[in-house]
Amino acid sequence: MLQYQIDRIDHQIADDRSQTGTFLIGPLERGQATTLGNSLRRVLMGGLEGSAVTAVRIAGINHEYATIPGVREDVLDILLNCKQLSINSSNPELEIGRLVASGPMEVKANDIQFSSQVEIVDGEKPIATIQEGHNLELEIHVERGVGYRPVDRKSEETTAIDLLQIDAVFMPVKRVNFTIDETAVAEGATGRERLKMEVVTDGSTSPDDAIAEAANQLIELFQPLATVTMVEEIPEEPEPSPEAQIPLEELNLSVRAYNCLKRAQVNSVSDLMGFSYEDLLEIKNFGSKSADEVIEALERIGISIPQSRTSV
């Protein structure tokens, strides 16, 4: 198998602090670039954990269609601005940020007070504009998660009349593109290719770390396949026939035969099916007359037992 390497050939940071990394992976055997590209892209776009704003509480507001006196943006605009925040929380539990501001003021992401475990990537992101003589109080909930989580209208949090839920996008990777160069990558090499990947993140993680995390997830996914365990199927025991479940009392045996069998711990037809004719004769006080009586009773219900232990 070819030993390939991955090189980051470009890295850019945009004004909104989003990051773009371009990687070149190769040399690869023909077909491997598509396998790697599709697998990495799927994990990068939907499998990485990230942070997102999941709810906002605005003082004096109890629904998203309201307006706030002295604030240029309406509630829906403020919720959208909060949803678009690039944020990174190292706390697996809920984090709550707070803002108390007075106008005139343009509120930006950096004005929200979080604990030291929360980093706001783009601190210049505008949130709201407050006019002179007016105030704005916000409470912003931040959680960690994977993928996309819609608002659950039946959750306990949504029953709070003043807590405005937001459908959360936890995905730290915004875009992944890849192309395949099918030309030879070394002199004399044929049938080889290279994979070129462009990874764009929201800035809460770097493209390098995103690639590494995606690769580790794929390793964990495929590692168990390296050791295939043979599982021996345990045959199912056949269910006993209805006749075998008939209790001894229903065979209408003589009192002597019945009592001898009960003392031998024979309680049903199923127990009798483990005996041969010779076995019956070995039961204490059980003679050939009683044994013949049992044989006849079993034959009446369509069951026969062997004459001897060695009979087939």
UniProtKB/Swiss-Prot annotation:
GO terms for molecular function: DNA binding; DNA-directed RNA polymerase activity; protein dimerization activity. CDD domains: RNAP_alpha_NTD. GO terms for biological process: DNA-templated transcription. Residues 1-229 are annotated as: Alpha N-terminal domain (alpha-NTD). Residues 240-312 are annotated as: Alpha C-terminal domain (alpha-CTD). The keyword Cytoplasm does not apply. It comes from the Bacteria. Its EC number is 2.7.7.6. Keywords: DNA-directed RNA polymerase, Nucleotidyltransferase, Transcription, Transferase. It catalyses: RNA(n) + a ribonucleoside 5'-triphosphate = RNA(n+1) + diphosphate. GO terms for cellular component: cytoplasm; DNA-directed RNA polymerase complex. Pfam families: RNA_pol_A_bac, RNA_pol_A_CTD, RNA_pol_L. Belongs to the RNA polymerase alpha chain family. The N-terminal domain is essential for RNAP assembly and basal transcription, whereas the C-terminal domain is involved in interaction with transcriptional regulators and with upstream promoter elements. DNA-dependent RNA polymerase catalyzes the transcription of DNA into RNA using the four ribonucleoside triphosphates as substrates. In cyanobacteria the RNAP catalytic core is composed of 2 alpha, 1 beta, 1 beta', 1 gamma and 1 omega subunit. When a sigma factor is associated with the core the holoenzyme is formed, which can initiate transcription. This is DNA-directed RNA polymerase subunit alpha. The gene is rpoA.
